[in-house]
């Protein structure tokens, strides 16, 4: 064992010594962050997760220690003993320890380091693949260490908050029954049950509801979940969520508890007071004004739905708009203020941008002093009455730019939603990443319970089949499922959905009606969810809950650019771990024991 470990103990971290510690003898452990020789003395910056301390090895104090210090190189792991002294006029104001240094009297090298494949510095140009391959070195860099320490603090604050509120931290299984539909699952073959498979849980949904039925009326868990989906910058195959469920509540009770948590996190982590209650917006309004159910409210530029106006004016001289309305599509406009002052070249680039999302083009018009339209093919055919009606609906002023999309509702919403955010970044209204100093929380409420699947010709649950419909909409369950709204809610922050939940169905008769509306027979429902249906008949209480995405929450709190920056050991967009080589091959013997055979044939 190293002498410093058995005989000496660390007295301080490398980030806590100040001038109040001058004269003390201290023991520090860490890594050599920097090394330089000056006037016969060896200087190093010693680093641990708390910060940096300058250490000086002088030849006339301990020649043997000075000689050993001459061997030090970057990333050597060492222990140092010495006295804290003032740096006099050589203060480094950038460091919390910048007023002092440690004059070393003893040194032990715990381990030497080969030259690192990249610099261990705050900002580096190394590609992400190399950093992921040597993730343990990447994690030595201060920005990532600060991010993970913030994540640990969020974990701690969350547990304390819910415990103080009377919640129980309870576990749910990772290996569960596979049920078709929903997210694609990771499957685990069962050796003891040949031909059978577990699924890794994509959420604790059913088990946390069963906790409510078992009488544990306040549950929470910081839990790992798994989804075998195509990955993006904001997705990982395994992710963490703050999972919550409560009995005897309505959605306002859930809002109250979760707003309390969010306010506490922003206060404790960032020192920012977030006002309550959070804004609420119906799903229908969110889609109409912003094109999605996670609007960024840090800036304005809402969409205006013109479908009824175009219908009232019988097309108003714009055949393409008229055709979209007759085809049961939608017509939308967005007013870009004159202050944006986009050139024709810039507007042409906007058209290329929307075409990349499947749009056929970008209709536009510049508003003149008298309300006339210029720089627009629409101006040649549109009737003065429809033009004025659109100007009024959009509150257009001279110099403003009007942008239009019309066609299939889902495409128009998506294109206009993305265009709005793209424009805001181009105009400097929001930064490319991070909050830009503003935090606009929003509850999006009352969405449809069902969405129509054109391929299957069936209604499907927009989220899951266990969400409670509005009582006033139960009359439409059989006759017109598209009219049924529900007690589902999403918590949105600056264009990101950071959580979602619902009030659950606790009435077995209504649950059966919901399944039938989705085309799920009694036999299929019992095969998939028989245990839950039985539990609903055993005095199930009214209950509801929510889950917050821990990874995204920390990403927003820290200003990170992607989820991979807030996860210690992330996967690539192909789902691979470049450090360990996962996923890897399995030998044939093990596959035989699992009764599994690979049909993959390499090209």
UniProtKB/Swiss-Prot annotation:
What's the Enzyme Commission number for this chain?
Answer: 6.1.1.23
Q: Where is this region: Aspartate?
A: 205-208
- What is the catalytic activity of this protein? tRNA(Asx) + L-aspartate + ATP = L-aspartyl-tRNA(Asx) + AMP + diphosphate
Q: Which domain of life is it from?
A: Bacteria
Which of this chain's residues are annotated to bind ATP?
227-229, 236, 497, 549-552
Q: Which GO terms describe its molecular function?
A: aspartate-tRNA ligase activity; aspartate-tRNA(Asn) ligase activity; ATP binding; nucleic acid binding
What compartments host this protein? Cytoplasm
Q: Which GO terms describe its cellular component?
A: cytoplasm
Tell me yes or no: is Cytoplasm among this UniProt entry's keywords: yes
Record key words, sorted: Aminoacyl-tRNA synthetase, ATP-binding, Cytoplasm, Ligase, Nucleotide-binding, Protein biosynthesis
| GO biological process terms held by the UniProt record | aspartyl-tRNA aminoacylation
Positions of the record's site feature: Important for tRNA non-discrimination: 38, 89
EC main class here is: ligase
Indicate which residues the UniProt annotation says bind L-aspartate. 227, 463, 504
List, alphabetically, the CDD domains matched: AspRS_core, EcAspRS_like_N
Self-association and partners:
Homodimer.
Protein family according to the UniProt entry: Belongs to the class-II aminoacyl-tRNA synthetase family. Type 1 subfamily.
This chain's protein is named Aspartate--tRNA(Asp/Asn) ligase
